[in-house]
Amino acid sequence: MISVKNISKSYKSVRALSGFSYDFERGIYAILGPNGSGKSTLMNIMTGNLKADGGTVTVGEGGEMPDYMFGYCPQYPGMYPNFTAYEMLDYIGILKNAENREKQIERFIEIFELGEYKNKRVGALSGGTKQRLAIAQAFMGAPELVILDEPTAGLDPLQRINVKNFLAEQGKKTAIIVSTHIVSDVENIAHEVIMLKKGKITLGGSLADVLSRVDGKCFTASAEHISQNFEGIYRLCGADMRIVADKLPFEGAKLVSPELEDVYLSVFGMGDDI
């Protein structure tokens, strides 16, 4: 178990994190929040790239986490441009003293469809290909904790699905923390969800618990059935749903279970980034 206790961090007068505490075990943890909520600050502290003003990050009974125990894919991954994709994976494997290094490399090359790029220099790769390579690097050496900051940035829809399926499988044996603006990337695979706002946990718990925080069911309505008075509204939850329910034609609306995006919008509002 990786335990984060009372982490705080300020940048001059701006409080980025305020008393963040959470325990991370095997499974997928989605950290959601608008820009400036403290997500990247938290991840940089957990990886040792940034010093907290206060608090601790410990493993097990209280020891510090060795570098080989975690993998990290930053939002803007840095790589050696003159290395080939294969050499980058090999280099990370050596640093982590990975067992069966060559087998791991070949496995990730296949999973992330890097075969045609493995002998090409990193500096010549596209942004999406570099991103897939960065995710593969994070899992080299079978770390106990993997931290992914906006891992699907620059990936096309099919690649995002591939990454999502990979994470779902890896989450059975690894603690994975994913920070993302793309809610659909973690919905249905996250075991726990943490919503951050201004450096504090606004909502946290299992996915089922978080989804239950929305007041009741949701209404959906196709555009052709929405009256001009509600132009642009396609999904309503809780109290909002009850207000307009009697104004929608019965055949044009239906009850559905809330989704993670509904919870996000109920916590942060329509004006925040998703």
Model features per residue range: what roles?
Residues 146-150, 155:
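Catalytic Walker B motif of ABC-type/P-loop ATPase nucleotide-binding domains
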Residues 47:
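Helix-to-loop junction immediately C-terminal to a conserved catalytic motif
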Residues 54-68:
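Conserved ABC transporter NBD signature motif
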Residues 162-244:
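ABC transporter nucleotide-binding domain
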Residues 121-125:
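Conserved ABC ATPase signature
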